[in-house]
Amino acid sequence: MRVSAGLMIGGSCVATAATVLNAFVINKQFYPSIVYLSKSNASMAVLYFQGIVLVYLMFQLLKSILFGDLRAAEAEHLSERTWHAVLETCLAFTVFRDDFSAMFVMQFIGLLFIKCFHWLADDRVDMMERSPVITLRFHLRMMTVLAALGFADSYFVSSAYFSTITKGASSQIVFGFEYAILLALVLHVTIKYLLHMHDLRNPQSWDNKAVYLLYAELLINLIRCVLYGFFAVIMLRVHTFPLFSVRPFYQSVRALHKAFLDVILSRRAINAMNSQFPVVSNDELSAMDATCIICREEMTVESSPKRLPCSHVFHAHCLRSWFQRQQTCPTCRTDIWQGRNGAAGGANAGGAAENNAAGAPPAAGIPPFLPFLGHQFGFPQAAAGAQVGGAQAGGHPGPFPHQIFYAPAPANRPEFMNLAPPPMPMAGPPGMFPMMPPPPIPQPNAAPGESSNAEPPGRPNFDRFSVEELHRMEGDMRDAILARIQAMENIMVILESAQVQMVQLAAITPLRRPVPTAEASEEETATASSVPTSVPSEEPSPAPSTPETASAPRSMFRGNLFNDTQSTSTPSTSAGPQPSLTPSTSSVPSTSSVRTPEADEVRQRRLAHLNARFPPPNPEHE
């Protein structure tokens, strides 16, 4: 069963009444009864608990008068901070064991009581910016709370100071520094309240409010850190190390560090927004949803909306306020520094976005890059095209540095470019790259109506573009030049990969002809005799029976760089003689190094048949 606050209050009142009645029944008089209550530990525990209940009731009454009903976030923050304050109070009791008394406990309870109102005032002022309606009663309550808290903090600071001066160092040092820190918090809340008030009185949004709030937070955190530092030094000289102040001191240092970094990063982000982020034109706004998600208002050209590197558009003043606290996109949470390094410059992005918004992509007739070679090296051309197209949907330019727009394939695309999906790679020998089937080779004897000899599509027409648009498409900035160099490097890698695969294919499939035997039939002999005399012969050398490999390939694209790499990566075959691949001067292929009478007879028949079918040319007719 959960114990409610009402049950605890009722039980405390009943226990207190029973304790007091018992003391008066035993002693019959007022003074002996008070002495009896003060000497009994059980009676003092009941009275202490009743005092805490009375403080709680007073807090609830003042809270309902000054703040009304608390929001869920305010109640949660108050509960968390109260538990931490109670634990710190218990640690403070261990430090001041000699000063422990009823007055000491009452002072700590009063300090916790005033701290709760400071926390509520801080949360309530922060809610001003998110509240749709600010009434006059709210202003009266806040001004009353801030004035009362400032007066109480000043009074207790001065009381602790004069008590330390007259009576020497005591536990009043703790209360003096605690109320001084609370006075700094009251100053911070007052500054935020005045800034919010000034912002509410302006018909338009106040752009510099976030800057003042950030600098005010930096100043207050610096004051808090200085106060905690002085308090730790004084406590080390008077008593011992204040263990109960470690957590708030660490929080103050961390808040100061965060505020300092926010000031630096916000200034960098605002400078980047003013100098590098492009301004969105009216055509782009009309082609997209022109609602700023920060202020939920329509964006116009007069408000100078800015486009982030992730292609999201917001008001300039909204981004300025947003960058005071964090340097990410409000929509996708992308870091603006990472996006800015991979995005295009302002001029290129603006020109490409205008072309895309007008519905006229500059490269409408350009097919995808190497459509007949992409699947040979495992490049997902379709997926890449879909990704680029998705990134540019709705008139947003993609992240490519000089804004290349990829158009879908034309409807009159030749059939030789409409290839089937790439098949699965074939398993090759161990240690080699997986082999892919070669592309279909057009037949030289194809019919005129077939599409194997179709011409590729012509060059696109750029006559309808102006000089400025062509310059924007060209991309003369540093990012565009680096992108073009990278594209040429990729082309070289693709061509060299094709050369390596062709060498590997030639190495694992050597050209060998079958050795004819004496039992060959007459049909096989006639078929073999029809081979022309210009076929090159493969003359094997007296090398060991190891597989014959071709020499290291030489790249036509990189000079000596690729050749050196291939020479180091190709196994050396200098241990044995290399095979000769040059055409032989003989008119017939050499079949075997061992000759038999049957083989000589077959050879003579072939020579006679070839001479009869292909007579030598007559020099007189030339």
From Swiss-Prot:
Domain notes: The RING-type zinc finger is required for E3 ligase activity.
Known pathway: Protein modification; protein ubiquitination
Ranges annotated as biased composition (Polar residues): 562-577
Entry's EC annotation: 2.3.2.27
Pfam family of the protein (one): zf-RING_2
Biased composition (Low complexity): 526-538, 579-596
InterPro entries: HRD1_E3_ubiq-ligases, Znf_RING, Znf_RING/FYVE/PHD
Top-rank taxon, per record: Eukaryota
Protein name, per record: E3 ubiquitin-protein ligase hrd-1
Protein function: Acts as an E3 ubiquitin-protein ligase which accepts ubiquitin specifically from endoplasmic reticulum-associated ubc-7 E2 ligase and transfers it to substrates, promoting their degradation. Component of the endoplasmic reticulum quality control (ERQC) system, which is also called the ER-associated degradation (ERAD) system, involved in ubiquitin-dependent degradation of misfolded endoplasmic reticulum proteins. Also promotes the degradation of normal but naturally short-lived proteins. Protects cells from ER stress-induced apoptosis.
Lumenal-facing ranges: 24-41, 121-141, 192-215
Span of zinc fingers (RING-type): 292-333
Subcellular localization(s) per the UniProt record: Endoplasmic reticulum membrane
Membrane topology note: Multi-pass membrane protein
Cytoplasmic side: 63-99, 163-170, 237-622
Biological-process GO terms, alphabetical: ERAD pathway; multicellular organism growth; proteasome-mediated ubiquitin-dependent protein catabolic process; protein ubiquitination; regulation of gene expression; regulation of Notch signaling pathway
